[in-house]
Swiss-Prot record:
Residues 1-18 form the signal peptide. InterPro entries: Her-1 (IPR015313), Her-1_C (IPR043108), Her-1_sf (IPR036341). It holds the Pfam family Caenor_Her-1. GO terms for biological process: male sex determination. Its main location: secreted. Glycans are attached at N98, N163. It comes from Caenorhabditis elegans. The keyword Disulfide bond does not apply. This is Protein her-1.
Length: 175
């Protein structure tokens, strides 16, 4: 069986490699993507990118395609799946005064909407989006935990699941 290495570039912090077979990628595209978008879906899986391919024009389609691709790609390893709806938790990084370019939030959103990257790889990359201590990652995990318990964080105030001092400007010594 031939394997296709998939390199997922994580900004300037390096990359990670995951192995999916060409056959599995093709099978997932055939099962989950419309015929006219299968090549685009294959590209999504090969390069670990978010769902696009025109599916974003309908608010429900990306979720269906994402879930289907995850189910096919990680059918034998359910722990590698991650809930697309948890991407709303990336908002915890949005007001970080230490990240004016919103790099952590953007990385989080891209990774959380990329169906071919396994959960552990995504979470490790989100956690390490800053070379310094990423205190907001704890809030991100708390948000995911609350969502798993059925609580929609969209109706919560930030302070209800995260310490507001985490977003305040911090001084760094020796950096």
């Amino acid at each position: 069986m031939r394997y296709l290495p998939i390199f997922v570039f994580l900004g300037s912090f390096g990359y990670t490699e995951t192995t999916l077979t060409k056959e599995l990628i093709k099978d997932a595209a055939e099962k989950c993507c419309t015929r006219n978008r299968q090549e685009c879906c294959i590209e999504i899986m090969k390069f670990g990118t978010p769902i696009r391919c025109g599916y974003d024009r309908d608010p429900k389609l990306p979720g269906y395609v994402y879930k289907c691709l995850q189910n096919v790609l990680f059918a034998k390893e359910p722990k590698k799946k991650i809930n697309l709806d948890d991407s709303v938790c990336c908002s915890v990084f949005g007001n970080d005064q230490n990240d004016s370019g919103r790099r952590c939030e953007n990385r989080c959103k891209n990774l959380m909407t990329s169906p071919s990257i396994d959960a552990a790889t995504r979470l490790d990359s989100i956690k390490s989006c800053s070379l310094l201590d990423n205190v907001l990652y704890k809030c991100f995990e708390k948000c995911r935990s609350l969502r798993k318990d059925g609580i929609k964080i969209e109706v919560l105030q930030f302070e209800e699941y995260c310490n507001a001092t985490f977003i305040q400007k911090r001084t760094f010594r020796g950096v």
